[in-house]
Amino acid sequence: MQRHKELYKEQSLVLSPRNHCQENRDRLQAARAKKREDCFYQNRIISVSPTPVKIKQLAAAQAALTQENVAPKLESPERLDTKPAELLKESNPKVSRQKLYLQRYMEWKIAKTKEHKQQDQKRRGAAINVPTVKQSKALPKSQTFRVPDNLASAKQKEAAPMFQPPKRCSLYMIANPTGKGKAAEPIKPSIPKPTSAAAPPSSNTVAASSALARHKSAASATKIVPAIRQNNNPVALARQKAAARPIPNTTKQTTSVRQPGIEAKKITTTIPRPTPATVTKAKTPGIRQQPPVVSTKPRLPEPPAPRTARLPNVLSKPFEKPLGNKAPVTRRANVVKPQPIRGGGGAAAKFKDTAGATSKAASHSIRMKATKIKSQYTRLQDNVRKLPQLKAELLHAATLDIPPLTPLDDIHNPFIDQATSTQCKSNNSSGHLLEAFGDTILLSPVAPVKAEGESSVKRQLLPEGKKEASGPVAKKKFDFTRYSVANSPAEDSLILDPQQTTVKEDTGDSTLVPEGTKTPPRRESNGMPNYLSPFVSVSRGKVNSRCEKEKRNSFYLSNEESPLEVRRAIESVLYFRLQLENEITRLQALCAEWEAYSKENEARLQETGGIDMINVTIGQTRLLTTKKMMQFSGLIDRCEAGATGKNSQPNDGSEDSKPVQAEDLEGWWDMLRLQSENVDKRFDNLKRWKANDWLDPDAVAEEPKQPKPKPKISRNMKIKSKAKPSSNLQQFLRKAHANMKKTKVEEPTLEDGLPATSSRHSSPRVIVVRNRRSFSPARTVLRMSTGEGRQSIAPNALLKSAILAAAEQNAAKTPPPKPRTSILKTPGTTKRQNRGVLFSAKKSVRRFQFTYEEGNISNDETVGADKLEDCEEDMSLEASTESGSLEQNPGRDSNQENEATPRTYTLRNRRVNLRPSSEFM
């Protein structure tokens, strides 16, 4: 609500709608109190015992009419003698309970009817211009607007009717032997004849039990002053307090200071026997010697003297909350005649005059029951609305001087750090405030105190050299709020004025001087429209953006003339029209500048070709300003016509008649800005050419790049020579090859009847090695057909073939022993069909290395056979699968050493029958 502080007028707390929840709670509280009170009354009379019955309320009211301030001693003895007889007669046990109930009901009904009539008369009220003297008759029950007794005549006092209490009241008496026995001597008051006012009664030492025993004879004393409902209006009570503020007389009691009027009331209403009326009788003439005080207020209802609060459990004995040890103020001597007790208490106790009010000790009270009506404290709004002088008070409040608005952030108080409980402490005397500040109505509660001179203790605590240094003002955030316009004169009088002038004095104090009451002026227009794009956010976050949107909408406070959307559209029109005019003016100035330059330097520009660049840029700029921007100007006019309703065309669905919104103007302007920036880049390029004397600034003379020197290859580098077989090895290979041919010629047919194999060139050439990169222990089989390549395609082909042939020869003569069978192999698995896989020699086999020993083939043939065992077995396996030979029986004994019988090996999970290599090579 801080950002809306200046936008809306403030309402009073009593009339504001904030009291709805409190009002509901007060209703429930009043209902509960009424229920408890009804329960109490129903349970009081439980039998037809000789319980003392109080006198009729009407008779008590008539008696109190003429004897308001008279003690019970002034009554005639005949009347005192007849009262016990009447009470005994009324409480006769022979009377049936039904008759008593009917009698009480009829009395209650009569009192209720009178109360309703008085309430209706009070609610209707009198005219505003009725003279004040007649208000006691027109509004007989009004406690707020009745005439003070010191101004009314005796005839009006006698004619003023008294009221009946709305509820049944207690018959019990209050005896206070402890408090009354300690009445001290009076101190010297400012009023003459003070001793008679404070004379203690003669029966102060009576015990509580004796007072209760004689409560029948004192019943008239308790009923002389009936309770009247207090009208608890905070506004009216505040006016009363400000209008008539008497300085009371003071007498010393045990724990508190009392006013003379309250003393008289206390003595009148709480004495258990009707004898000590001389105190009041002696006090009254002494007070009447003072001249009456005539009020100088205008013709508003004149309030009475301040009345004291009444405790909820006692009907006619008021008490107050102790206010502490405050010294009595005896500056003014205008004493008002004490008023009769008319039911104080309620909300009026909150508005008592604290400067001159006295306090009574709450410890003297004896709480018995609650007879206070709770509704007096509640339903403040309804009670205020029913006041007859409400309009007059509101007009009077509107014409009062309004206190200045004191913003905390604009005032520097040098005593903020030194303040403890309060910032501004003063004496209890209001006269000192008047001397120091003059009119206290316009005193700001937070402004620095302006004292006369340097006598203040706080100011002496300040360092001497310390002065208010005007530091740099911090940069404030962007504020979207704006003042509203008050149209009616009533609002002008009620709106607080935010315009103030700060006056700097030589002493360093800053004083706020309020200006004249007037409506804050609107923001002065400096030619810039009040527009912010709806697509632009100057804050971060969803919550901040939402608050920013609310502030932006608060720009356009709706009034009676135009709604919010219209004002927003008009602001957009003004903004974009101004932006468009500025942009067109700027671009046209650039075109004129370059045209003048091209005419002055036409020869140089034609020589270098720069005149064409200038003409192209100027042409694009004029095309933009005369076409696109003129079209945008037409859209702005259409948006304004749609918002104001002037020169607007009906929407027939065509492009020319569609309504244009502020968001459409925003999008168009963004597109125009892109084209305008493109034109600006062209003008910047012209400036670059102009600075380079119309030579291409990007065409820099590039130096020929020297190629990087390649690394020289030295002819002395060692080239790996291919391994050449030694002469002994060549001879060995030739010999082995010849022996192989001889062996094939001698064996034309195979033992098993298969056709003889073809020559070595037609048979598949198989090389089996281990792949060193593979983790599997299985051997890699390389198979190459004869027709795919020559035998001498590899440098070691001759060597390999010779070694394999020699190994086959040795294996044919002496077969190697059977190797161990792996424990991971299963012997009884069925034979799977083998698939020949052709591997690339370059990928799988990187290098072949055969271990051999020269000369050991012929001498020790077993060594070579053992070293080439892996190669021999795998080669035999591949040869057996490729040749498609007959399958041998796996169950045949594998221990047969005959050459014709094939060997059986276990490979992985199957058995493989191997035939001798001599059949293939």
From Swiss-Prot:
<keyword id="KW-0597">Phosphoprotein</keyword>
<dbReference type="GO" id="GO:0005819">
    <property type="term" value="C:spindle"/>
</dbReference>
<dbReference type="GO" id="GO:0051642">
    <property type="term" value="P:centrosome localization"/>
</dbReference>
<dbReference type="GO" id="GO:0031616">
    <property type="term" value="C:spindle pole centrosome"/>
</dbReference>
<comment type="similarity">
    <text>Belongs to the SAPAP family.</text>
</comment>
<feature type="modified residue" description="Phosphothreonine">
    <location>
        <position position="826"/>
    </location>
</feature>
<feature type="modified residue" description="Phosphothreonine">
    <location>
        <position position="519"/>
    </location>
</feature>
<feature type="region of interest" description="Disordered">
    <location>
        <begin position="500"/>
        <end position="531"/>
    </location>
</feature>
<dbReference type="GO" id="GO:0000922">
    <property type="term" value="C:spindle pole"/>
</dbReference>
<keyword id="KW-1003">Cell membrane</keyword>
<feature type="compositionally biased region" description="Low complexity">
    <location>
        <begin position="273"/>
        <end position="285"/>
    </location>
</feature>
<feature type="modified residue" description="Phosphoserine">
    <location>
        <position position="76"/>
    </location>
</feature>
<dbReference type="GO" id="GO:0007346">
    <property type="term" value="P:regulation of mitotic cell cycle"/>
</dbReference>
<feature type="region of interest" description="Disordered">
    <location>
        <begin position="861"/>
        <end position="921"/>
    </location>
</feature>
<protein>
    <recommendedName>
        <fullName>Guanylate kinase-associated protein mars</fullName>
    </recommendedName>
</protein>
<dbReference type="GO" id="GO:0072686">
    <property type="term" value="C:mitotic spindle"/>
</dbReference>
<dbReference type="GO" id="GO:0005654">
    <property type="term" value="C:nucleoplasm"/>
</dbReference>
<keyword id="KW-0963">Cytoplasm</keyword>
<feature type="region of interest" description="Disordered">
    <location>
        <begin position="273"/>
        <end position="325"/>
    </location>
</feature>
<feature type="modified residue" description="Phosphoserine">
    <location>
        <position position="792"/>
    </location>
</feature>
<feature type="modified residue" description="Phosphoserine">
    <location>
        <position position="444"/>
    </location>
</feature>
<dbReference type="GO" id="GO:0008017">
    <property type="term" value="F:microtubule binding"/>
</dbReference>
<dbReference type="GO" id="GO:0005886">
    <property type="term" value="C:plasma membrane"/>
</dbReference>
<dbReference type="GO" id="GO:0008157">
    <property type="term" value="F:protein phosphatase 1 binding"/>
</dbReference>
<dbReference type="GO" id="GO:0051726">
    <property type="term" value="P:regulation of cell cycle"/>
</dbReference>
<feature type="modified residue" description="Phosphothreonine">
    <location>
        <position position="51"/>
    </location>
</feature>
<dbReference type="GO" id="GO:0005634">
    <property type="term" value="C:nucleus"/>
</dbReference>
<comment type="function">
    <text>Cell cycle regulator.</text>
</comment>
<feature type="region of interest" description="Disordered">
    <location>
        <begin position="641"/>
        <end position="660"/>
    </location>
</feature>
<feature type="compositionally biased region" description="Low complexity">
    <location>
        <begin position="193"/>
        <end position="208"/>
    </location>
</feature>
<keyword id="KW-0472">Membrane</keyword>
<dbReference type="GO" id="GO:0051382">
    <property type="term" value="P:kinetochore assembly"/>
</dbReference>
<dbReference type="GO" id="GO:0007059">
    <property type="term" value="P:chromosome segregation"/>
</dbReference>
<feature type="modified residue" description="Phosphoserine">
    <location>
        <position position="785"/>
    </location>
</feature>
<dbReference type="GO" id="GO:0007051">
    <property type="term" value="P:spindle organization"/>
</dbReference>
<feature type="region of interest" description="Disordered">
    <location>
        <begin position="809"/>
        <end position="833"/>
    </location>
</feature>
<dbReference type="GO" id="GO:0007052">
    <property type="term" value="P:mitotic spindle organization"/>
</dbReference>
<dbReference type="GO" id="GO:0005737">
    <property type="term" value="C:cytoplasm"/>
</dbReference>
<feature type="modified residue" description="Phosphoserine">
    <location>
        <position position="554"/>
    </location>
</feature>
<keyword id="KW-0539">Nucleus</keyword>
<feature type="modified residue" description="Phosphoserine">
    <location>
        <position position="49"/>
    </location>
</feature>
<dbReference type="Pfam" id="PF03359">
    <property type="entry name" value="GKAP"/>
</dbReference>
